[in-house]
């Protein structure tokens, strides 16, 4: 398994690579599995969905997710948890 940074991913797509690196939550890592059956548009779609991934904050009392820390704080200030 090799670790790629985002520059390497961009370079792969610029060269028209059809193998798609599989990312993990802790970092971007490359899976050595054969992804030769993926077309270039499919690979680009997977790459774009990776870019759209957002961080979120969770209220541990009610398990709700928020897109900003400010929204989480507002929730904690306004909602009474049992």
From Swiss-Prot:
- The name this protein goes by in its record: Host transcription reprogramming factor 10
Write down a Pfam family by its short name. zf-C2H2_jaz
> What's one GO-annotated cellular component?
extracellular region
Tagged with keyword Transcription regulation: yes
Q: Which UniProt keywords apply?
A: Host nucleus, Metal-binding, Secreted, Signal, Transcription, Transcription regulation, Virulence, Zinc, Zinc-finger
Gene name, Swiss-Prot/TrEMBL: HTR10
* C2H2-type ZnF: 57-81
Q: Which InterPro entries match?
A: Znf_C2H2_jaz (IPR022755), Znf_C2H2_sf (IPR036236), Znf_C2H2_type (IPR013087)
Q: According to its UniProt record, where is this protein mainly located?
A: secreted
- Signal sequence segment: 1-19
Query: What does the function comment of this entry state?
Result: Probable secreted effector that translocates into the nuclei of host cells to reprogram the expression of targeted genes by binding on effector binding elements in rice.
Protein location: Secreted; Host nucleus
Q: Which domain of life is it from?
A: Eukaryota
Q: Which GO terms describe its molecular function?
A: zinc ion binding
């Amino acid at each position: 398994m090799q670790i790629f940074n985002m520059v390497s991913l961009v370079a792969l797509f610029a060269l028209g690579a059809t193998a798609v690196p599989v990312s993990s939550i802790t970092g971007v890592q490359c899976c050595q599995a054969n992804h030769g059956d993926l077309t270039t548009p499919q690979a680009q779609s997977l790459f774009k969905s990776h870019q759209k991934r957002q961080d979120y904050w969770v209220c541990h009392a009610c398990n709700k997710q928020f897109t900003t820390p400010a929204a989480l704080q507002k929730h904690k200030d306004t909602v009474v948890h049992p």
